Amino acid sequence: DHNDDWYFILTDVTDPVCVTALCKWAESTEPTEAALGAGVEDHRKFYFGQTNDKEYVNEYGRSVVTYADNLAEWADAAWVGSVGPFWPESVTWKWKVPDGVSVADLRDSERDLLEENRVNFMTAEYKHEYMKNGICGDGNFIDNVLGADYITHQIRENLYEIFIANKKIAYTDDGFALVA
């Protein structure tokens, strides 16, 4: 039996080639409108990974990659553990401090490159340590992508419940009010 009812994926893989493959795979899980219209279930996924490659580039919008000097700190898992349990619309991923994650030892040029390449990292700025920038590989904020996925899922669930529970939805103000 196959259970595809999950959302986040994290692995212990840190090799850049494998991280990129997982980012690409997560990107491929978002169904097209045509597929959804044909009845394909929406089981989109979201990948969190980490690397110690200061030149790594993340190009995929359904993934987040963190940079860490010490991969044994599992910055990606610590970040998901500190923010993931909250409802998508109730939390911002930037500015969070995952437990047990050290500030990366980076020169300014390396920090700039990581930001340009859409890779998140622990930073110390203005006497505060936090995860920067809270973005996915396409530059969108993590909370925006997770929130949009959550809203999409909830709308679909609610519409199915309405259509199943009602014999007919009239094409009237009352029908529109029921669906709205």
Regions found by a protein language model. Name each.
Residues D1-V97:
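Extracellular Cys-Trp
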Residues G134-A180:
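Structured, hydrophobic secondary-structure cores that serve as assembly/anchoring elements
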Residues A68-V145:
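Extended, charged amphipathic alpha-helical segments
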Residues D15, R107, Y171-D173:
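Alpha-helix initiation/capping motif
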